[in-house]
Amino acid sequence: MKIALLGNPNTGKSSVFNMLTGLRQHVGNFPGVTVDKKVGEIKIGEETHMLIDFPGTYSLYPRSKDEQVVYDVLTDPSNQDYPDLIMVIADASNLERNLFFFSQIYDLGMPCVLVLNMNDVAQRAGKHINIEKLKEAFPGASIEGSNARLGTGKERILSLLENAADKRPESKFLKGSEIC
């Protein structure tokens, strides 16, 4: 299974990648561009899966080469990096901005996991996140908290990934080619 690791810049995405892969990564480029990608392996149960760390992205409506790479991969099932599952890392202390991007990913209708990272920063700021409300807002998405910098939440994330592959939200994302 290919798992795409996505999120806004500075959400701790690389920390989650390193926590899940144990720093086992390969750096390469996406075909045709100079944007780096990191690929690592994670073990879920008895199976080994590929985790692809994509560049930090604010939106599926690309404004940079990095965002264009993410858009191209996620909207083209024939792309060699097209994922079976998407994991979005969100900064729990800045959830509104991060949920904007997650809502776009969710609307693709692909199996997805939302990891609320940096819970300690959110708590110090006096923020309490109601995960049940998030699950109501995004039915079919798997949602969990973590603090990758401290190494907490790894087993819960792996469990979510194992169970999320069969959950598929209804797609609300339309490409122009589907309409015209």
Where are these regions (language model features)?
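Amphipathic alpha-helical transducer elements in NTP-driven molecular machines
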Residues: 32, 36, 64-67, 71, ...
